[in-house]
Amino acid sequence: HVDSRSRRKQTDVYFYNTGSRASRNLTNTMKNVFQRKYAHHQPGRGFRGTVSKRDLFVLRNTTPVAAFIELGNIQNKYDQQRIVLSNNRQALANWISETFVIDYKNYKKK
């Protein structure tokens, strides 16, 4: 999901969960992966992401563990680059995929 808010927020990415332990773990892992990747690829820039519970239809009505991610404000020219540039889209997809692998491995340990 791409955030369509008109005003620039200082948050880079919003990670929403259902409130269940598994969903919270997944979104916290996502935030940690993104934070680590931002530190590596954009040192000194910092990363601001938030994890919170949201009562969204798509989260409530999904059987597997779910997360909803807002990647930016489409009306902001800097955030647009996350979506418009194919390398950026691929990086985001890779980071999200990495999160699922980490989350799965953590789940198997339990």
Identify the residue ranges that each predicted region occupies.
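Active-site-proximal helix/loop segments of hydrolytic enzymes
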Residues: 1-110
